[in-house]
């Protein structure tokens, strides 16, 4: 019975990962093959950092759609096939840049793409789905404000708010799934609440400190949106 429940949960998780991949990959393709919007240029975000992040996310989603409850094992072909697929897509992606106004192929972008894929697969080699998802999400919400040289909240207030709320809510949910409670212990209580917010608050503090150290804008509105995301994540995990 327990195995059946676990199998059904894994199948449901795979469906969600396939749906996420079906939405993410086409969106990534479209955004990479249109002229760079003026607001993106104004934000002055590190291009190589963005390549690293989006390919790390793509690789995580690809693997999770194939084996949502297993780690990458390099003795089997799965990890190598995912890496080959990402490499092939990255080559096609860079090749098509010649046909887009204002864009050009760059070998350094390819290196950043492969670095993102390699890091994601490395994480998936060590960790299973929930902690791996938490790490990839943490990388995303940590790196974006550090990479942006302009205040994203001023340039794109709605999108930036959605990003922080959604990103920190997702991380909080994944974080709570990684917490282990003694058998029979109550899921909801002060100890559970403290453990649930400890990781997200540590991530928020690290992002704030790193952004300030790098001279990047990460102010009270950014932190408020992130705190809202943490609250949403805790409330969803609680129910």
Question: Predicted regions: what is each one?
Answer:
Residues 2-92, 98-99, 118-239:
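Bulky hydrophobic segments
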